[in-house]
Amino acid sequence: MDALNKLKQFDAYPKTLEDFRIKTCGGATVTIISGLIMLILFFSELQYYLTKEVHPELFVDTSRGDKLRINIDVIFPHMPCAYLSIDAMDVAGEQQLDVEHNLFKQRLDKDGQPVTTEAEKHDLGKEEEGVFDPSTLDPDRCESCYGAETDDLKCCNTCDDVREAYRRRGWAFKTPDTIEQCKREGFSQKMQEQKNEGCQVYGFLEVNKVAGNFHFAPGKSFQQSHVHVHDLQSFGLDNINMTHFIKHLSFGKDYPGIVNPLDDTNVAAPQASMMYQYFVKIVPTIYVKGDGEVVKTNQFSVTRHEKIANGLIGDQGLPGVFVLYELSPMMVKFTEKQRSFTHFLTGVCAIIGGVFTVAGLIDSLIYHSARAIQKKIELGKAS
């Protein structure tokens, strides 16, 4: 018994008899409010505990031989698919080789709705195929270039050959209906059919992980003196409207919290023949999920520049949308980690103890203030 009596001396929570306890409406109100506050703060702390903690690291990128995946979904509401070409270039201006891609062109009407149910597969750097079967023609034939023959190009067996001959002469290609090769391939029919249409380009590119660019521009693309240019003589600069809507553009896979700054970017061209350049800085990124899955991807920042392109074959800039990218030598690594359970318990205890203590102080203040006021009222009545 003596031991138990001595143990009672350490009780930090002395109890009072039930008969000496006073319950008030103010105390009940404080209790209810403090209980609600405890619940709100508890669920807030629980939500914070259940979210993953992400630790960033920065180091030099030493990876070699990797490919860069570019995810594209861009709409050109006033540029027909038959006019639009897509090319990927390296930093030296040469067309990239060994580019894996899966790009599609979807024709759109004036309201932005698909004209056909199936999108057309696009071959990077190649012109659209004709509607006729070339195997039905004599392979040894030599057709006319309509006065544009040169020593290097004496025979023009396709519409593209005639266009190339005209380009070399510096002639405008404005009368395809009078050229047998173009009539046979349905060149004018295709152009006229899609004249007032738009085009949606979507899919992906996988290019070498070096600085370069990819672009969307009207006209046939070709190399001239080691410079990549487009032949626009058959279009006329006044007919080129490069208004565009970038639904999605990213470099690699998505990961939690990623921000793609060009998504849902809508740019209306103020006049014809505009050249838009997006200068992109890519930061290689590794994201390690809590289950150990590793996602290799990229983040990027972007700056836009625009100007009027006055050149017909690229000597003063080309109308189009150009994305010029370069890679940072640094790599960012994000690692997901589960938050500490002991920290969660500590936070919950701090919430309960803190709210309980503050509520007790408020209740005591309310009670003693009410008692003091009541006494003054009673003294006033007595006098």
Swiss-Prot record:
Q: Which residues form the signal peptide?
A: none
**InterPro entries associated with the record:** Erv, Erv_C, Erv_N
Its function?
A: Possible role in transport between endoplasmic reticulum and Golgi.
Q: Which residues lie on this side of the membrane: Lumenal?
A: 47-341
Q: Where in the cell is it found?
A: Endoplasmic reticulum-Golgi intermediate compartment membrane; Golgi apparatus, cis-Golgi network membrane; Endoplasmic reticulum membrane
Q: What is the membrane topology listed in the Swiss-Prot or TrEMBL record?
A: Multi-pass membrane protein
Q: Name one GO cellular component term.
A: Golgi membrane
- Region labeled Disordered — which residues? 110-132
Q: Where is the composition biased (Basic and acidic residues)?
A: 110-129
Membrane topology (Cytoplasmic) = 1-25, 363-383
Give yes or no: UniProt keyword Transmembrane helix. Answer: yes
In its UniProt entry, what is this protein called? Endoplasmic reticulum-Golgi intermediate compartment protein 3
Q: Share an example GO biological-process annotation for this protein.
A: retrograde vesicle-mediated transport, Golgi to endoplasmic reticulum
Q: Does the keyword Cytoplasm apply?
A: no
The main location is: endoplasmic reticulum
**Taxonomy, superkingdom:** Eukaryota
